[in-house]
């Protein structure tokens, strides 16, 4: 459930990095639309994400956030509209083609090989970036050249000491951290994170906030999260979706007091 009341009322605003100035558009959607058998999940969405920015997409369940992510990364084909990545038109491209143009994403649900170690996961991801592509049944020797870089990426997400532990034995927060290491292994210019703190306790949430801050350096990040503390702590731009449409956009401070957002999400409670 989207905790809108925790976002829109009271509280001290967290500090975030300022919005990049004089930068180009890293990711852009124009009139992006998706229909599923008569149901419009995404409705003429216009979105601009600036290079180096951290941009949050928020809204209740069913607002179209994940569908929008799927459209931006090629997992779902749009019914109408255009998507560009640094001026390259990627509309309708396959996910791997978009990845090679510098866009990578995580998913809401963790999807790891339980018997592989974090190091093996990252080595395979690094291998997948090369012309060799993913070749799962290769000898350990063939992955050895990726060993040092894999360890660096694992250290970056706080998993250095767990590099040789089977992924199935990792705690939930550690699995999410491993997924971020896998996304980082693709060396993306634009990183999309779908609910990176979903299902986490308070301590894991705070660790994840710091982790995203680290991996965002030198990159453009777009993320979805229902936790408004996370949004306020990370995002220098926020887009609010409702029923597949853009309801409001601005800084966290601006959007949290936008009358359209207050009316949409707190109107009934305030009238009661």
Feature-to-residue mapping (PLM):
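Glycine-rich phosphate-binding loops of nucleotide-dependent enzymes
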Residues: 2, 8-272
